[in-house]
């Protein structure tokens, strides 16, 4: 699914056959994260990947779980939803999660799809969660990005 500002990367059915993918999603803001989680799993399975899934409490718990999964899986997808509140907590959480997910991928060499929404309002999250009439599907996008990157890394390793 192509969106304004998002690369038009698509996976062919079966292109990830034999690949293992972990989908780890926060439980906080479950009306949003449940959709992100389900859509990430669906995208990975459509590509032929073997999927394992877990839930953690909130976005701050994602980096450590993702780092552990990076040791055992070909690609990892992290989903969550952080909505701006009245304090600096939003910025602190967003920065920590983004840094942690990026570090997990860089330290391990395993692609991490970042499906953590960082939005000002619940309505913005709904528009990005892939539901009916949503403008975007960030859960699917994160899975596709992680799997596509894993496939590119395989090509690089083979010198193709």
From Swiss-Prot:
Enzyme Commission code(s) on record: 2.5.1.78
Keyword terms, alphabetized: Riboflavin biosynthesis, Transferase
Gene3D superfamilies: Lumazine/riboflavin synthase
Listed GO biological process terms: riboflavin biosynthetic process
Residues involved in 5-amino-6-(D-ribitylamino)uracil binding: 28, 59-61, 81-83, 114
GO function term, MF aspect, one: 6,7-dimethyl-8-ribityllumazine synthase activity
Top EC class for this record: transferase
Residues at which (2S)-2-hydroxy-3-oxobutyl phosphate binds: 86-87, 128
Pfam family membership, one: DMRL_synthase
Family listed: Belongs to the DMRL synthase family.
Role, per record: Catalyzes the formation of 6,7-dimethyl-8-ribityllumazine by condensation of 5-amino-6-(D-ribitylamino)uracil with 3,4-dihydroxy-2-butanone 4-phosphate. This is the penultimate step in the biosynthesis of riboflavin.
Name by which UniProt lists this protein: 6,7-dimethyl-8-ribityllumazine synthase
Organism phylogeny: Bacteria, Bacillati, Actinomycetota, Actinomycetes, Mycobacteriales
